[in-house]
């Protein structure tokens, strides 16, 4: 019973990471105000650790660091589902 829940949790986490990894900055992120732009650099005295900037950094990190590992993980999950699914 616990293993069934962990498997579903793994699939949900993998799906969410895949969703963040494929977000297009030009098409989607800029429309909702989460694109990386140089004209929004904070001036002296402004806090640059806002929630919005942290979300933009998290999306950029996921897209940069997890793109190649996600390809391998997705291939393993597809093969697992085809053989044992």
Swiss-Prot record:
Keywords: Endoplasmic reticulum, ER-Golgi transport, Golgi apparatus, Membrane, Protein transport, Transmembrane, Transmembrane helix, Transport
Entry GO terms, CC: COPII-coated ER to Golgi transport vesicle; endoplasmic reticulum membrane; Golgi membrane
UniProt main location, coarse: endoplasmic reticulum
Mode of membrane association: Multi-pass membrane protein
Effect upon mutating residue 18 to A: In YOS1-1; impairs interaction with YIP1, blocks ER-Golgi protein transport, and causes a severe growth defect at 37 degrees Celsius
Compartment(s): Endoplasmic reticulum membrane; Golgi apparatus membrane
GO BP: any one term: protein transport
Transmembrane parts of this sequence: 2-22, 65-85
Record family assignment: Belongs to the YOS1 family.
Purpose of the protein: Required for protein transport between endoplasmic reticulum and Golgi apparatus.
Subunit structure: Component of the YIP1-YIF1 complex, composed of at least YIF1, YIP1 and YOS1.
Full protein name: Protein transport protein YOS1
Record gene name: YOS1
